[in-house]
Regions:
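C-terminal membrane-adjacent module
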Residues: 118-200, 341-372
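Short aromatic-rich membrane-water interface segments that cap or initiate transmembrane helices
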Residues: 1, 63-79, 131-145, 204-214, ...
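Membrane-interface helix-boundary motifs at transmembrane edges
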Residues: 20-35, 91-103, 161-172, 229-241, ...
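Membrane-interface helix caps and helix-loop-helix hairpins in membrane proteins
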Residues: 121, 134, 257-265, 284-288, ...
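A contiguous pocket-lining binding segment that forms or flanks enzyme active sites
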Residues: 310-355
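A glycine-rich, hydrophobic loop/mini-helix early in the fold
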Residues: 35-72, 234-279
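Hydrophobic cores of alpha-helical transmembrane segments in multi-pass inner/ER membrane proteins
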Residues: 6-18, 77-91, 142-160, 214-227, ...
Length: 372
C-alpha cells in the first residue's frame, strides 16, 4: 500500500509542478528548492529516530556483544540513498552537470529501489533494539513514505523541467560520471557500512600505527587532489564542489544521532560545531562566519588528527565516524579557501579565533562536553 502511495504522490506532485510552472521557470526552481529543503529537513529529523542498522555487523564485536548478522542488500540500498542528501541539494542549487547527471541516473534509481524495498527499511526502523526515538509504527511508515516521495519527485522535476539529459556524445561527461560517482560514494560512506562489509574487532588502533598514518596521508592527499582537479574550473563548478563537501560534512555529523541523542553528541564540541558553521557560512555567504569556523576548529582538528581518540574496532562505527568527521573538518575549509570560494585568512581574521575558542570553552564548561 505504501509503495503505491509513494509512487502516485511523486507522480501527481511532479506533474502538477511541471504543468503549473511550465511557462514560469523561476516558479519551478523556487518550488524545487523548497522541496529539496523539506527533503533534507525530513532526512535530518529521521536521524534522530530509532534505527537498528548499526547492529548489522559482518562478524564482529560491538559494545561487548558479538554479531554475526549481515544484510548487505539493505546497506547497499542505504548507501546509494544516502547520497541523495548532498547530491540532490547540490544539483538543485547549482547547475553542475555532474551532480545533475548523478541525481537523475544514480540517486533516482536508488530512491525508486528504496521505495520498492520499503519494508526492508521499516524492519530496522521499528526494531525495539534500535537507538533514537521510538515513535508509533503509523508515523514511521508515513514519515519515511513522504521522504521517499520527495526523493523521487525532485530529480524528475529537475530533469524534465530543465530538459536535462546526459550528453552521451561527450567523452568528458562519461569520464566525469564514472570517476565522480565512486568518489561521491567514497566520501559519503555511511559509518555503518564498513562493519557491515568488513566486520570489526576488539582491537583499538594505536597512535602513528600504519592505520593512523594511512588516515593522515589519505586526508591530505584527498584535499590536494580536489584542489588540483578543480583549481582552474569555473566559479560555478568550484562552488558546487565545495557546497557538496559542506553538505557531506553536515549530514555525516548528524548521522551520529543514529546512536541516540545525548548531551555529549550535541554540536558544542568544535569539530561537531563546524558542520553547522560551514553550512551557515555558505547559506549566508559570510566570510567572517567561515573564518570564525575555520580558526576556531583548526587547533582541535589538528590535535584530533595527530593525537586521535581511537575507540575499539578498526572499522567500527565510532572509529569510522571519528576518521570521516575530522578529515572532512580539515578538507572542507582547505578546499573552500584553496578554490577561492572564501578568501584566505588575513591577520585581522585571527581575532575570530579568540572569540570562537572562548565560546567553545564556555559551552564546554557549562554543558560538560569537554569529555567525549
Amino acid at each position: 500500500m505504501y509503495q503505491a502511495i509513494i509512487f502516485s504522490s511523486a507522480a501527481v506532485i511532479s506533474a502538477l509542478v511541471l504543468l503549473l510552472c511550465r511557462k514560469h521557470e523561476n516558479c519551478r526552481h523556487n518550488i524545487l528548492k523548497a522541496l529539496t529543503v523539506i527533503f533534507c529537513t525530513v532526512g535530518f529529523v529521521r536521524f534522530f529516530l530509532s534505527d537498528s542498522i548499526t547492529y548489522i555487523i559482518n562478524g564482529g564485536w560491538f559494545e561487548g556483544v558479538r554479531y554475526e548478522q549481515t544484510d548487505f542488500f539493505n546497506v547497499i540500498l542505504r548507501w546509494g540513498y544516502y547520497t541523495n542528501y548532498a547530491v540532490l541539494t547540490t544539483a538543485v542549487f547549482t547547475k553542475n552537470r555532474f551532480f545533475r547527471n548523478m541525481a537523475g541516473y544514480f540517486s533516482l534509481p536508488f530512491s525508486i529501489l528504496s521505495a520498492v524495498y520499503y519494508e526492508d527499511f521499516m524492519k530496522y526502523f521499528l526494531d525495539p533494539t534500535g537507538k533514537g526515538y521510538h515513535l508509533t509504527p503509523e508515523f514511521r511508515y508515513a514519515f519515511f513514505a513522504a521522504e521517499l516521495a520527495l526523493a523521487i519527485m525532485i530529480p524528475i522535476i529537475l530533469h524534465v523541467g530543465d530538459r536535462h539529459v546526459f550528453n552521451f556524445k561527450d567523452a568528458k561527461e562519461w569520464v566525469a560520471y564514472f570517476l565522480g560517482v565512486p568518489a561521491v560514494l567514497l566520501v559519503m560512506t555511511p559509518v555503518y557500512a564498513t562493519p557491515s562489509f568488513l566486520g570489526t574487532n576488539n582491537l583499538a588502533p594505536q597512535w602513528f600505527s600504519p592505520y593512523h598514518l594511512i588516515w593522515i596521508g589519505a586526508t591530505f592527499v584527498i584535499a590536494l587532489i580536489i584542489y588540483y582537479i578543480f583549481r582552474f574550473q569555473s566559479f560555478e563548478v568550484r562552488h558546487s564542489v565545495c557546497l557538496f563537501f559542506v553538505l557531506v560534512l553536515f549530514f555525516h555529523y548528524n548521522s551520529l544521532y543514529l546512536m541516540g541523542l545525548t548531551l555529549k553528541r550535541l554540536p558544542f564540541q568544535l569539530c561537531n560545531f563546524a558542520a553547522y558553521t560551514f553550512l551557515a557560512a555558505f547559506i549566508l555567504k559570510s566570510k567572517k562566519l567561515f573564518h570564525y569556523g575555520f580558526i576556531a576548529n583548526i587547533v582541535g582538528t589538528m590535535f584530533a588528527i595527530l593525537v586521535p581518540d581511537f575507540g575499539i574496532g578498526y572499522t567500527g562505527f565510532w572509529n569510522m565516524h571519528f576518521l570521516f568527521e575530522h578529515s572532512l573538518v580539515l578538507i572542507v575549509p582547505a578546499i573552500c579557501m584553496g578554490l577561492q570560494i572564501f578568501p584566505r585568512l588575513s591577520k585581522r581574521s585571527m581575532g575570530y579565533y579568540f572569540v570562537g575558542f572562548s565560546i567553545y570553552i564556555t559551552f564546554c564548561y557549562i554543558l560538560g562536553t569537554i569529555e567525549r
